[in-house]
C-alpha cells in the first residue's frame, strides 16, 4: 500500500531539517573544507527527500538534482551565495572574526539547505502525485521563496 502524501510530506520535512542541521554543523569547520561537506549533505538530503516519495536516487543523482535546483535560481543568486561563503571564509581566517564568519556561514547555509529541501520536496511531491514536472522557472520561484523565508527568520 502506498503511503499517503501527508506521510510523505512529514517524512520529507524531517529529512529537510536533518539536512539543515548537517550544513549548519559544517559552519564550524574551516571554510575551505566545509564546501565539500555542505555539498555532500545537500546531495544526501536530496536523496533522502526523494526516498520519502518512493524515488530511489544514487548520491550522484541527488547531487545532480541539487545542481539543477541551484541553477534554476540564476547566476546572480548563485554568485551572491558564493560571495557570502567567501566573505565567511575571509572572516574566519582572521581568527578575530571566526565566530562572526561561522555565524554568517551557518545562517546562509541553513537558508540554502531549506531552499534546496523545499524545492526537492515540491519536485518529488509533484512526481508522487502524478502531476506534470515543474518547470525551471517554477523550481526557481520555489527556491527563491523558501530561501527568503528562511533567511528572514
What is the predicted role of each segment?
Residues 1-26, 43-73, 88-90, 100-153:
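Terminal, membrane-proximal amphipathic helices
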Residues 22-38:
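Conserved phosphate/anionic-ligand binding catalytic regions in large, soluble enzymes, centered on
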Residues 72-85:
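A generic, lipid-embedded transmembrane alpha helix
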Amino acid at each position: 500500500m502506498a503511503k499517503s502524501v501527508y506521510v510523505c510530506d512529514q517524512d520529507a520535512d524531517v529529512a529537510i531539517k536533518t539536512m539543515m542541521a548537517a550544513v549548519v554543523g559544517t559552519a564550524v569547520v574551516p571554510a575551505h573544507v566545509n564546501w565539500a561537506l555542505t555539498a555532500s549533505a545537500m546531495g544526501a538530503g536530496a536523496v533522502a527527500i526523494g526516498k520519502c516519495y518512493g524515488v530511489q536516487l544514487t548520491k550522484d543523482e541527488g547531487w545532480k538534482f541539487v545542481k539543477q535546483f541551484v541553477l534554476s535560481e540564476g547566476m546572480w543568486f548563485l554568485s551572491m551565495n558564493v560571495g557570502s561563503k567567501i566573505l565567511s571564509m575571509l572572516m574566519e581566517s582572521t581568527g578575530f572574526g571566526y565566530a562572526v564568519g561561522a555565524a554568517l556561514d551557518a545562517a546562509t547555509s541553513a537558508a540554502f539547505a531549506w531552499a534546496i529541501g523545499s524545492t526537492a520536496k515540491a519536485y518529488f511531491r509533484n512526481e508522487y502525485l502524478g502531476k506534470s514536472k515543474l518547470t525551471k522557472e517554477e523550481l526557481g520561484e520555489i527556491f527563491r521563496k523558501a530561501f527568503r523565508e528562511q533567511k528572514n527568520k
